[in-house]
Amino acid sequence: MNCSQSILRLHPNDNVAVALAPLHAGADLGGYAVGSDVPAGHKVACNALEIGVPVVKFGQLIGRATQRIHPGEHVHAHNLSFETGDIFAPVDDRKALALPEPTRTVFRGYVRPDGRVGTRNFVGILASVNCSASVCHAIAARANAELLPGLQNIDGFVPLVHDHGCGMQSSGEGFEALLRVLKGYRDHPNFGGVLIVGLGCEVNQVTLYKPTNWRDARLSTLNIQETSGSASAVAVALGKLSLISKAANEDMRTECPVSKLTLGMQCGGSDALSGITANPALGVASDILVGNGGTSILSETPEIFGAQHLLIHRSNAMTGRKIEGFLHWWKNYAAKNGATLDNNPSPGNKRGGLTTILEKSLGAVAKAGQSPLTNAYAYAERIDTSGLVYMDSPGYDPVAATGQVAAGANLIAFTTGRGSCFGAKPAPSLKIASNGGLAQSMPEEIDVDAGPIATGAVSIASKGLEIFERLIDLANGEKSKSEMFGYGDLEFVPWKIGATL
């Protein structure tokens, strides 16, 4: 990584560099001048590029020049594009980072009878269908006001509602995905108890979620149609929650190994520095966790498109085939809906300097660190192996994170370059800024600033260790910025696949 005061060249083979600060036309870059004003995070050409020449960043192709580009010229959507045929699988020649030793390898969590461990002790109120959503919110409001003050060991009553559960087939991809999500939340170790509320006539019947495990005494269901109406349903629910929460309030934190942590990794509102600072640092934190027996989940299949070789080359044959299968499904799914995977970067991504899906994907995959990929799972499928794993999901953060939590994540780490107002329940979320400007402008949202990596003030390894230590703090009960604000009730967004009937 070559770094000057104003630009950063990430790999010796790169023919573009990243602006660390706004560059003004005429500024000297050491042998050539800036051709026009270039925003921070955007790319400048290091040498002349003819039409059709590969543009290389991270040592990997990110697209091709669509016009002649002079040294020092801004490289972005006006002169760089990507075609599907540009995807190829070069050897990953990145040097392995030496991982720092963590100072702590234990945390204090809630041990559940099924062997999993919670980092929080919420009581969940899950809607089986959108028709019960308002009642679920009313139940939670009453429970938090009337029951919670007398319950010292419960973090709160959480209403988790969604916009489907009826008007759908009772089989197929969409229904199975919803079942996995709600069953995953029903059994989640961060819930000390759960109440599932339905209307009564929906496709997604509450009887599908009968207790099947240690929650027998801590799970109950309720159909509004079996009461006198909404107000009566709330009253009945409070009686049920009184019993559930009394049992959950007996739960206490005990010392547990970090191998009991499952980390869901997310990125959203990414910029060009995300793949240089925050994502690689999170990758180090993930490697430390995996090295101590824990589990990390990488997701967002549309955002690994073009960089999948970096994952497949370190997985076994079965896992590699699963990832290729996910991508094949997504190509067909996108085409059926008039979309393409190569048009993924959002307007915010582009304003932050990301031009093509290859460039975005190469940065996103950096969250995976350097651990072997041990398995791949369907959306919201229960994670049953340790190590670095992959879970299929959309790139839309709330949907992806909902699937990760359903799969068993008891912590979420979320990197951002443009800014994010995300938070999840019942899993606490740590937000990591890719640049110091964001950390300074949105201090109410950011838990860790990875910006100093870009200037060489700190190493990726040391920042990764800091992220790992902060995750341990969260696992012990310390609140993240998103928890302080109260995020999570409205960020529960199960993936909706298929037609609404």
For each feature predicted by the language model, list its residue ranges:
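Metallocofactor- and cofactor-centric catalytic cores in central/energy metabolism, strongly enriched
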Residues: M1-L411, R418-L501
